[in-house]
Every structure is written in C-alpha cells, then in structure tokens.
C-alpha cells in the first residue's frame, strides 16, 4: 500500500478544484493510504462536503506561521526585484525567488510535517503549492513529488497582473526539481513543452457528479457554473453574449451558479442590459445536479 499525500490550500470549501480533489483522493483511497494536508483551519472540517466522510481519507491541518518583519522585508524586496526583472531570471536567482516567496520559517514547518508522515508520494494541488514543494524538494523524503495544475496555461502565464504572469521563468526553472507535473489537457501539455521545455502528462478531470434527471431543450435555459472571477470563467463575456442572443430569443433564460469577487459587477452588468428577469445568479450549492437537470444547454 502506497502512502499518498495531497497538499492543498482548501478542501472544506466550495469549488471545482476541491470537488475534483475529493473525487480523485476518494478513488485512490480504495487501494492506498491517502492523506489530504490542508491549510483549512481545523474548525472548518466538514466531512459532509463532497461525501468526504464516506471515503477512507485521513485529513491533516497545517498552519504556516506568520513571517516576522526582519524576514519579510528582505524577502519582499528580492521578490520585487526578481519579478520586475531588475535581476536576471536565471536558475539560481529563480531558486532564491522561490525561497523569498516561501520564507525559511514556513519552509521549515512544511518540511517537518511532510517528512514526519513518511509519505511515498506528495502531490501539490495547484501551481503555488507545487512551487512551494519544488523549493523544498531536496529536503523531502518522499520518493516522488508531483505538481498538479488546475488552471490553463494561458490563464497562468498570459494574464497580466495575475497568477504567474511575472513568474514564467521561475516556474520553468523551479518545476524541473519535481518528479512530475500534471496538467488538465493535451493542449496545455503541448504549450508547456513548447514554451517552457517542461514535459507534463495530461490527465483530464473525472466526472465528479452522478447525473440526476435529464435536461431538455424545452426548458430554454442556459446554465453555467463556477467561481465568479474574470480569470477563471469570464461570466462577463457570457452575459454580453446572452444580451445579444436575448434580443431575438425572448423565451430563453440564463442561470449562473457560483460566488466570487466579480458578483457585484455582474449584477450591475445584468441591470445595465435590463435582464434582471432573464439572468439569475444563484449561490453555490451541494445540490448542483438539480440545476443541470433543469437546463437545456450547459456553457463551460
């Protein structure tokens, strides 16, 4: 039996990454010893989410300590110089940037937690935690340490001001320290190979829901689901498209299920187009299957 650890920022909250992690970890736990190490606080633990309580998964909580100002200031200064290319973004400076963005005080805690449990495989869930693991790979006992990407290449590296836009070279240099990288599509795999000279494997997300009911064109309803952030879904573009479509298709409606920082702007956009009676924003729910079953078209 292999001991596998998934290191994530959150599992006890609502989101697509959390749901996929729960499904994958649950399936693997049937034959192996699986631990999810999360930055969630212990009081956030809710085993009803994603049916986690029905799986043979162990949960551990880790709290990375705050950084004192005498450690924070030099790290912050170096990070600024690196990201603005005032210093060259070569392998050694990229390694130092990895240390400056994940200071020694926090690295020490994570190394101790992971090594004390003697895992065979450690998986960093998403880019930033994978980069943390890359910076300490040489100190970890695990046989394999893997980074699992949950956002597209273009969102990571080609979105100014967000994600890894100023860290492309750091990612290129640091991720070679890991024993593997997982991406979600073959299209992204090809981009990593061509632009970063990294060679990930592509593993598509599994079906994470059991279908209940059946949608029908007769409902004349579009459905889209996800976090309300321009970087991840682009619901603003969807609303603009629906506003055009709605001019000549009076019976159709649009429902968006989700929450996030873009919600107030989306509500204003809906009001600007006078679509309050045709576009609905619903909160995240654990009963999302009912929304799928009442829709005609799902917009990804």
Regions found by a protein language model. Give the residues of each.
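An aromatic- and histidine-rich active-site surface loop
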Residues: 95-109, 121-142
